[in-house]
Swiss-Prot record:
This is TCP pilus virulence regulatory protein. Its main location: cytoplasm. It is found in: Cytoplasm. SUPFAM superfamilies: Homeodomain-like. Keywords: Activator, Cytoplasm, DNA-binding, Transcription, Transcription regulation, Virulence. Residues 172-269 form the HTH araC/xylS-type domain. The keyword DNA-binding applies. InterPro entries: Homeodomain-like_sf (IPR009057), HTH_AraC (IPR018060), HTH_AraC-typ_CS (IPR018062), ToxT_HTH1 (IPR044875), ToxT_N (IPR055025), Tscrpt_reg_AraC-type_HTH (IPR020449). Probable regulatory protein for the tcp operon. Disulfide bonds: none annotated. GO terms for molecular function: DNA-binding transcription activator activity; DNA-binding transcription repressor activity; transcription cis-regulatory region binding.
Amino acid sequence: MIGKKSFQTNVYRMSKFDTYIFNNLYINDYKMFWIDSGIAKLIDKNCLVSYEINSSSIILLKKNSIQRFSLTSLSDENINVSVITISDSFIRSLKSYILGDLMIRNLYSENKDLLLWNCEHNDIAVLSEVVNGFREINYSDEFLKVFFSGFFSKVEKKYNSIFITDDLDAMEKISCLVKSDITRNWRWADICGELRTNRMILKKELESRGVKFRELINSIRISYSISLMKTGEFKIKQIAYQSGFASVSYFSTVFKSTMNVAPSEYLFMLTGVAEK
């Protein structure tokens, strides 16, 4: 670590479709990153975020969310990803330096996993210059506090951070979450815990669409079961359990009420093979 163990800097070179996974070594700290050219996609393993970034984007992943994210290059040419790991203690020390109540709320809010700014290139160039200097210059703690608090305050005021986890509605968020662990016995408490939101908020949004929670979970699992059927590699019993149903009989009941045909018949229509 550099700068009294407050920072760690790395640059990763990525070819098209290469994926950089933000590991869980520093989950109690923050990660800030940007790419030098082209485009890449930031992906949440729970599917709550899938967002294309470019060389104007700066992303700050907040503590306890780092391990959920990965970055995939979509560029034909190689790109470089600059990543800074910033200690939680350093971020906390900035509170008295940052200008603007909005930036303070956004930076320290536990309800937002990340902040994203689409900046002008000169702002990114200044950040890159300071970060590149870590290897040769022994910056004082005071300089780093003044620089980063000033940088955060400036970009928030000029560009306004984007909370990209807010782009999806409740149904999409729940759907993506269930798909990420299809066999889990999802309950309201699990969903609300993962999404960091109140049950009444989610329930109200589902009710406004005439959708019941258990029906939504089952429809997601039925959709997944059909994708397994299309491969022609699984029997009904395997499909039922791999789709998250507790029993084959319950799977068959839900499937027939949804598709108006028994799963064995549907499998035959897809593959032409009758299950014995």
